[in-house]
């Protein structure tokens, strides 16, 4: 047996991980502007945390979850999404308490797990960035969160994104619509896919979300949720739409969009872009006002979204967006002879402690090979340190692009390299 990574996973190697770090850092910066703070939850939860909140009949629970019994016979699942664990944490840690500022705003980043057919941008271990806002039923919260997602996508460089918007109404509106959908689909049951025939019995709204051709045909003339909204639901949705328009945010009403999780109510949304003729959802979310109470907390409004990092990076690559990643070394020290080994170690460490990104040769190679390494690392400056330089205490620092040189003491480099760096045309932060 070859020792290889499991199917549906990937190794994120240094050239790629730099992109991941940029995206995650960029998201943190945007979220901070909106007063969000990071929360980190376990990657595994009790099975019921996911099954009861996401929905027993959803594809995630019935087909895709990684679940097992641990050595204490506890039913455990690897988290397939981020909202339910954050809500569980919110309730368990009593973050609904009066002394905690409302609304409470959290973001998270980390791996999720679903057993599904691996494909580009969709793996069995995937990574999600998401936000959750608790304690505000104000439709302005819906809009602020949607706009924050749009803000992130625009500034990171995603092109051609369209906002798809729908409402699922409150529980009363949803129940009325559910019955109308059953009445419409029941005569068409035999024309539906096998999965949608099952969904019709368990959760008919999920038929609207099916990607199967026969199901798409069947729901073409299905009733619209917009015809079943009561006054409260209509008022909320109208307010969301008006505020989006006030902020100049274009949107498309998509009444067949229901999202894959059972906990949503009122506003739901997706940001969709087209790649090679296919629509790809890059970010999605919505309101879930009943979920905190479902976990044993008080009635608390909630709104959030999630986006997949793998898919985001895939879209950026397909759209030719180059992330502004700085990988260059500030200094490379080429070492000549055993007599320079100790001093090279002292020097590279002194540079790092001054805040410079520095590397040295450890392999006793010929200078030509060391200079090539400096080029591979895109080193801005180059120091050649041999036994004669150690004895004299003087060394040449070279701009590795222009070949301009300055002669300086080793003591100056160890104490104030910034001055030399700037003299050679580079600027320190």
Swiss-Prot record:
InterPro entries given in the database record: aa-tRNA-synth_II, aa-tRNA-synth_II/BPL/LPL, Anticodon-bd, Anticodon-bd_dom_sf, His-tRNA-ligase, HisRS-like_core, HisRS/HisZ, HisRS_anticodon
Catalytic reaction annotation: tRNA(His) + L-histidine + ATP = L-histidyl-tRNA(His) + AMP + diphosphate + H(+)
BP-aspect Gene Ontology terms: histidyl-tRNA aminoacylation
UniProt keyword annotations, A-Z: Aminoacyl-tRNA synthetase, ATP-binding, Cytoplasm, Ligase, Nucleotide-binding, Protein biosynthesis
Any single GO CC term annotated in Swiss-Prot or TrEMBL for this entry: cytoplasm
Assembly with partners or alone: Homodimer.
Family membership: Belongs to the class-II aminoacyl-tRNA synthetase family.
Protein name: Histidine--tRNA ligase
């Amino acid at each position: 047996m070859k020792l290889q990574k499991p199917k549906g996973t990937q190794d994120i190697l240094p050239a790629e991980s730099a992109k991941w770090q940029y995206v995650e850092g960029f998201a943190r910066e945007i979220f901070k502007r909106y007063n969000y703070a990071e929360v980190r939850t376990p990657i595994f939860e009790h099975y019921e945390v996911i099954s009861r909140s996401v929905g027993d009949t959803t594809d995630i629970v019935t087909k895709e979850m990684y679940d097992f019994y641990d050595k204490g016979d506890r039913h455990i699942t690897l988290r397939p999404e981020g909202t339910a664990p954050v809500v569980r944490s919110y309730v368990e840690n009593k973050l609904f308490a009066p002394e905690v500022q409302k609304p409470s705003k959290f973001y998270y980043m980390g791996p999720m797990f679903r057993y599904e057919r691996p494909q580009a941008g969709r793996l069995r271990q995937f990574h999600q960035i998401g936000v959750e806002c608790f304690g505000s039923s104000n439709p302005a919260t819906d809009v602020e969160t949607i706009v924050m997602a749009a803000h992130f996508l625009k500034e990171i460089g995603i092109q051609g994104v369209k906002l798809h918007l729908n409402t699922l109404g409150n529980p009363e509106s949803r129940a009325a619509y559910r019955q109308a959908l059953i009445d419409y689909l029941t005569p068409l049951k035999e024309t539906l896919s096998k999965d949608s025939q099952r969904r019709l019995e368990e959760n008919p709204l999920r038929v609207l979300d099916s990607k199967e051709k026969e199901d798409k045909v069947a729901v073409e003339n299905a009733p619209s949720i917009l015809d079943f909204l009561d006054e409260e639901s209509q008022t909320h949705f109208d307010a969301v739409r008006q505020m989006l328009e006030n902020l100049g945010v274009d949107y498309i009403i998509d009444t067949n969009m229901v999202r894959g999780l059972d906990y949503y109510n009122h506003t739901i949304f997706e940001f969709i872009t087209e790649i090679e003729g296919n629509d790809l959802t890059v970010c999605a979310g919505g309101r879930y006002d009943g979920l905190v109470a479902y976990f044993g907390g008080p009635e608390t409004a909630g709104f959030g979204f999630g986006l997949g990092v793998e898919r985001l990076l895939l879209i950026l690559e397909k759209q030719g967006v180059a992330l502004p990643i700085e990988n260059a070394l500030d200094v490379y020290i080429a070492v000549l002879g055993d007599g320079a080994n100790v001093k090279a170690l002292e020097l590279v460490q002194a540079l790092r402690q001054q805040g410079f990104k520095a590397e040295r040769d450890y392999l006793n190679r010929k200078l030509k090979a060391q200079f090539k390494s400096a080029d591979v690392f895109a080193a801005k400056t180059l120091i050649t340190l041999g036994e004669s330089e150690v004895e004299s205490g003087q060394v040449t620092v070279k701009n590795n692009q222009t070949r301009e040189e300055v002669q300086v003491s080793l003591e100056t480099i160890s104490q104030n390299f910034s001055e030399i760096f700037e003299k050679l045309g580079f600027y320190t932060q």
